[in-house]
């Protein structure tokens, strides 16, 4: 005869597993909307120290520097910005990849930069990481602290120009 206590324990174990899975997805989705769909992106900083402070506040996020070069631009200007990446599995952009146009457009929209839609697919995109633990999981060149600071400063100047248009 089956042990009734064992049956109850198995049932509770299954309920706990289902509950933990549901909780994981709930918080994952909530974190996504808070971090990625927030109208004020977490990733626009004036220094790496500010990045580190924000990372302490949002430990689940990995900060990535995206560097976009648009050949359609007369000056071939680089636009550099920091954006929070929820997981390291977030799709990264690769060089000359038209099928990522929609994703690139989505990211650019989130930081309120306005570009001609048809030119985005021609952009050469390179991904640089600020933090070594992110770099180790991506096949991308790593920024030094000085390079990252320069990138952030350059982005802030560039963003200021675009916002004034």
From Swiss-Prot:
The chain crosses the membrane at residues 16-36. It is found in: Host membrane. Keywords: Host membrane, Late protein, Membrane, Transmembrane, Transmembrane helix. The keyword Transmembrane helix applies. Induction: Expressed in the late phase of the viral replicative cycle. It is a single-pass membrane protein. One of its GO terms (cellular component) is host cell membrane. Belongs to the asfivirus F165R family. This is Uncharacterized protein F165R.
């Amino acid at each position: 005869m089956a042990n009734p206590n064992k049956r109850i324990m198995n049932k509770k174990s299954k309920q706990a597993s289902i509950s933990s899975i549901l909780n994981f997805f709930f918080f994952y989705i909530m974190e996504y909307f808070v971090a990625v769909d927030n109208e004020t992106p977490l990733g626009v900083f004036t220094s790496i120290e500010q990045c580190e402070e924000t990372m302490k506040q949002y430990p689940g996020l990995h900060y990535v520097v995206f560097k976009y070069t648009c050949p359609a631009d007369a000056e071939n200007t680089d636009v550099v910005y920091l954006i929070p990446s929820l997981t390291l599995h977030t799709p990264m952009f690769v060089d000359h990849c038209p099928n990522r146009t929609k994703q690139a457009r989505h990211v650019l929209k989130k930081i309120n930069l306005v570009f001609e839609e048809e030119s985005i697919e021609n952009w050469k995109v390179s991904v640089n990481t600020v933090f070594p633990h992110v770099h180790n999981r991506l096949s991308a060149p790593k920024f030094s602290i000085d390079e990252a600071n320069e990138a952030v400063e350059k982005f802030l100047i560039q963003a200021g120009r675009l916002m004034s248009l």
